[in-house]
Amino acid sequence: MTRALPIPLTFASFADVEALLRTFETTPCDEPGLTELDHGLQCAEALRKMAPDDVGLQVAGLLHDVAHGACHIDAHHEVGADALEPLFGSRIAQLVRLHVDAKRYLVATRPAYRARLSPISMQSLMAQGGAMSDDEVAGFEARPWWREGLRLRVADEAAKVIGQPTSGLDHWLPLVRSVCAGPGGARA
């Protein structure tokens, strides 16, 4: 589970994001039996069910672990958000950034949530600071899009089912393109 220290991760265009997602088809996920793409697709699908009209949230779900492999697991949300923001804007970047703290928030505010965590998530929770303090909870609730960040986190935890059918990457790429403001994106 431990990875190297953060290295720069940048995307110059939609094509760069697509290329990385395609490598995730064969990149093992920390969750046994899944690839990084399996996990991202399951997360996006769960968010499509929770928030069918929020394509940005769904895309954030697909991309939330984009920095896995590029940095230490504890920093992947920051590295990923920083890499995505130039192409996808502040909302999608913030949602990616929030997904780690959202786990800490949910464990602090909903005690039953801890029981839903996989062993890998429990291990990373401890490395990421454990349950939030009351002050951290208040700070989290002051951040933009924090409620959507909770949805992303719930979907993230649910997206760990070996063999779960999902729409494939080719289904999701036009949606990713539709919210991309960089070269090759629909909002460019």
Residues of each region from the PLM?
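Metal-dependent phosphohydrolase cores
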Residues: M1-A188
